[in-house]
Amino acid sequence: VIDFYSNPDNRYSVPTQCGWEEIVTVKPFGNLIAKFDTGNARYSVLHAENIKVNGKKITFTNNNKTITTKVIGEYTSITGGGKDERYLVDLDFEFANTNYGKITFGLDNRDDFNTDVLLNRKTMRMLNVMVNPQRKYVITTKFESE
């Protein structure tokens, strides 16, 4: 038992507390406000407008920046508002000055929400954070989004 736990690969590190709202960086869009959602979302979601698909490429706009990238899949999101078809893309992601490489986002128009990004539990496990539902901006500051 001691040998097993003496190997750092066999230990879980204690998650860092974060607020339910923090600033993240999604390249090439820059710093965006994200909701850390402990619900059942299958994928993290990124706000997208003017979505146009041409074969295996997708063009969309976020934060007045338009990009074209590869579609890696599609899925049906079932929410309180009904069913919604969403495209999946991989984008570079940073949080708290750490680059996590590419993560998968579903694209959706989030105009009716206060945040451009919704992070699911899978992404939060990768970030090794636990959400304090009483707090916002524990790790980052809202000023980073301006």
What do these predicted ranges mean?
Residues 2-146:
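Pepsin/retropepsin-fold aspartyl endopeptidases
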